[in-house]
């Protein structure tokens, strides 16, 4: 016999403008067209945007920046995470350490790097690098970028089922790579079986986070003060 399967189609650069019930289906509309579906999963987490959903009210945004060096060579560079591991320390405001396929050293931490001058990021990166990898000597930092994190007051993610056939998740609190993989499989199992026992957590009520903007500002201020202390060698 011949087996066929429907291959998924991935649409890019087509932000959702509206999500509405249309009979037994959901209509997901963008500026370029619409898709009808029996089931919809909103999995955009901190990058959820638009007036078509109030999901943004259920977390407060934070940020994480990374700084990348030029490609590093030599014995000192080869001793840094030689098996391609990622690493994090346990400081009050953590630092992440990894290397990419081009041999760059990537350092990261909590905070909005887009709001900080380049000299500040370089000084911070120099401080972390010289502590952990002093044998490297002076490093040239070439790139920096910032991503967004969805925080919740209790540091736990939220699973929602606002309506039949509609699921949402948010609030990974910076642990989206591993946790999101688990939730993705659990959502798939739940949509196929309808069994809530397949979910890692029960569904949460749709309760907005109070004072979300104030929380975001307070977190960012704390991160920035800590990084300033690192640059001034008050803390490490």
List the predicted regions and their residue ranges.
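Short, conserved active-site loop motifs that form the nucleotide-linked donor/cofactor pocket
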Residues: 8-9, 166
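Short, small-residue-biased leader/transition segments that mark boundaries at the very start
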Residues: 1-7
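A conserved short coil-to-beta-strand element within the FAD-binding core of flavoproteins
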Residues: 9-26
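C-terminal catalytic lobe of FAD-dependent flavoproteins
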Residues: 115-117, 122-232
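Active-site substrate-recognition segment that forms the wall
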Residues: 16, 34-74, 78-164
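Terminal low-complexity segments of carbohydrate-biosynthetic enzymes
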Residues: 235-236
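Residue-level signal for beta-strand positions within conserved beta-sheet cores that form or flank
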Residues: 3, 12, 24, 103, ...
């Amino acid at each position: 016999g011949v087996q066929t399967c429907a291959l998924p189609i991935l649409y890019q650069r087509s932000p959702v403008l509206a999500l509405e019930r249309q009979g037994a289906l959901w209509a997901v509309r963008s500026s370029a067209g619409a898709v009808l579906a029996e089931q919809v999963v909103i999995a955009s987490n901190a990058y959820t945007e638009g007036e078509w959903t109030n999901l943004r009210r259920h977390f407060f945004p934070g940020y994480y920046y990374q700084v990348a060096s030029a490609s590093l060579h030599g014995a000192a560079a080869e001793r840094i995470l030689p098996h391609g591991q990622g690493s994090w320390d346990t400081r009050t405001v953590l630092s992440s350490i990894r290397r990419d396929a081009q041999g760059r050293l990537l350092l990261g931490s909590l905070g909005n790097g887009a709001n900080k001058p380049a000299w500040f990021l370089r000084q911070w990166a120099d401080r972390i690098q010289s502590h952990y990898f002093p044998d490297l000597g002076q490093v040239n930092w070439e790139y920096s970028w910032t991503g967004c994190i969805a925080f919740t007051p209790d540091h736990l993610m939220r699973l929602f089922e606002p309506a039949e056939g509609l699921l949402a998740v948010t609030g990974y609190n910076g642990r989206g790579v591993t946790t999101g993989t688990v939730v993705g499989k659990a959502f798939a199992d739940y949509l196929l079986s309808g069994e809530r026992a397949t979910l890692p957590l029960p569904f949460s009520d749709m309760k907005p986070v109070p004072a979300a903007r104030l929380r975001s500002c307070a977190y960012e201020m704390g991160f920035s003060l800590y990084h300033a202390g690192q640059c001034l060698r008050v803390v490490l």
